């Protein structure tokens, strides 16, 4: 992927780098929990009647984790219902591109499924979800199509899908990761329409 060549400061994505990033995100999440839970526990120990305040404190920590997962969910925008001729044409061409096996999933969820060496990708208009082998961890990537916002929605997905097929590791290198964590955390934040896609991969 040519975009990866102009970003030499980014280490090329690989199985090893994705595993490392996953561990970093897990440590960060654990750090958030500890940061908010320890003072809450200390507060209860000092003054048991302060339990409601401690609960609010822990709630703030949980909210931070939800906000991070929500950010990942917002970065992957599914295709909406086609309203114009060009939109319907683009969706038809995208359906041919993904093949019969995943066309039904595309129509149902608005995301295109692409299986690769790094895992299963669910591609939307402005990014993609990578479900790692085993299905327990996901990485959310945000990436914009350079040609602009006047393209039909399905064309934007097609551009990202073709880039992913051309160079999977390059795609993961260029795209901006905005969440990594357990699949169930992301499933709580995505639109109901998208959830079947996460269940199927």
List PLM regions with ranges.
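N-terminal alpha-helical membrane-insertion module
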Residues: 1-74
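A short beta-strand signature
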Residues: 126-127
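Phosphate-centric recognition/catalysis
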Residues: 123
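Cytosol-/stroma-facing membrane-proximal "stalk/adaptor" domains immediately downstream
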Residues: 133-201
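Short amphipathic alpha-helical segments that mediate assembly, nucleic-acid/protein binding
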Residues: 11, 99, 154-155
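N-terminal topogenic membrane-targeting module
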Residues: 61-119
């Amino acid at each position: 992927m040519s975009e990866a060549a102009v970003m030499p400061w980014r280490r090329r994505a690989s199985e090893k780098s994705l595993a490392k990033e996953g561990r970093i995100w897990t440590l960060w999440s654990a750090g958030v929990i500890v940061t908010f839970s320890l003072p809450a526990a200390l507060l209860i120990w000092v003054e048991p009647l302060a339990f409601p305040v401690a609960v609010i404190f822990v709630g703030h920590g949980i909210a931070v984790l939800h906000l991070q997962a929500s950010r990942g969910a917002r970065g992957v925008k599914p295709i909406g219902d086609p309203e114009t001729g060009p939109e319907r044409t683009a969706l038809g061409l995208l359906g041919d591109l993904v093949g019969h096996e995943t066309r039904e999933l595309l129509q149902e969820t608005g995301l295109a499924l692409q299986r690769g060496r790094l895992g299963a990708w669910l591609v939307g208009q402005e990014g993609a979800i990578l479900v790692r082998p085993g299905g327990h961890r996901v990485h959310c990537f945000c990436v914009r199509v350079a040609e602009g916002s006047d393209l039909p929605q399905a064309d934007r997905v097609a551009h990202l899908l073709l880039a992913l097929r051309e160079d999977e590791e390059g795609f993961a290198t260029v795209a901006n990761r905005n969440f990594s964590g357990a699949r169930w955390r992301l499933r709580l934040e995505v639109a109901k329409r998208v959830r079947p896609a996460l269940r199927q991969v």
